[in-house]
Amino acid sequence: MFEQKHSITLLFNANKVYDRRVIAGVGDYLQTSKVDWDLYLEEDFMARLEHLDEWSGDGIIADYDNPEIQAALQKAKVPVVGIGGSYANPADYPDVPYVATDNHALVQAAFEHLRQKGIQRFAFYGAPVNEHARWAQERENAVLEITRSQGYECYVYRGHPVRPETWQYTTKRLADWLKSLPTPIGIIAVTDSRARHLLQVCDHIGMIIPDKMSVIGIDDDELARYLSRVSLSSVRQGCFELGEQAARLLHKMLKGHNPPKKPILIAPECVAERQSTDFKAISDPHVMQAMHYIRQNACRGIKVEQVLDYVGVSRSNLENRFREERGHSIHTEIHNEKLQRACKMLENSNEATSQIAKICGYPSLQYMYAVFKKHFNQTPKEYRDAMKNNDEEDSLVLQVS
């Protein structure tokens, strides 16, 4: 028996990464189920919200974090499924079937990741109160509840909107806040965009990441990942599942089933761990300074002598400090940093191996081949193929239970 054909409107901003992932989840449900839907996705749907009641389709899946969309759909004559953030107060949920990203679980995952690194101080970089971003306040409330319940103090700063005309003022205020914090400290940012702003300001004021401040964002936005010198750790939201579950829910409603009375909460996918939270409790300030320089410059082909010049101590002095703190030499630290970068690029990019060798500071492709043979008994190509054939997540991606 064939499914009845339906016309479904998606009210999302396809220019946003979060929305695109949700839309992809809806599309995947179409591909894997028997639904026969025509999907309508307008680029400028906000300009036509007032005429939504004239639409003669069969169902709507919409971004209910947007108050204008909520208002426009109050008198909708077709089944509506809302997608948005979760709320601690059940009374805050809209009066429609609702699929929510679990804000408390997102913050919990970020907090646990930092605590597992041995971090004992916490801060939260949020966002100004905004009716279009109520999820930001929910995440702030969640981090305060979690840290207090575990016996930790949490420093909170909402900051200001980041705009070109107020950039200097906003950056100065953020820098002042960062300088006031005790270190070492772990900072949870409300989004990857705010986390990237943190990393930029830390770089400007000479705050060492992650030794003094470990930073983790929320979204795992690829753009934010590549726009900072230090790669950003982030909690990956279950956006794909949000879309998939919303489509499944609407499908059931169109078949006459009653929707659930409670919202469906979607947990985060995982924590993608990168340099910004690669915290190791280093007490020696000279080693900490050297580590910062090595992270920033290892792939530029630096030698031990340049590290010594940067730190300003003798080789024997710094080598002894390194062996005590890190268990190996300065040269090994440089080598490990380059190798780790090469491994990540082989796993996560489609760059040619020759280009990766160049980017990671190896004198030649043949040299990188020799390094991989020595460490993994594989060529770079064999290493890449093995990683792609591995069904398990990258060893630097921690699954959230």
Positions of the model-derived regions?
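A secondary-structure capping/hinge motif
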Residues: 322-329, 371-383
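Short Lys/Arg-enriched helix C-cap and helix-to-coil transition segments
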Residues: 332-334, 383-385, 397
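Bacterial carbohydrate/catabolite-sensing allosteric modules
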Residues: 1-59, 69-310, 315, 319-320, ...
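Residue-level signature of transmembrane alpha-helix interfaces in integral membrane proteins
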Residues: 235, 377, 393-395
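Residues within the helices of the helix-turn-helix
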Residues: 305, 331, 354, 370, ...
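Recognition helix of helix-turn-helix DNA-binding domains
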Residues: 329-332, 363
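C-terminal end segment of the histidine kinase catalytic
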Residues: 368, 392-399
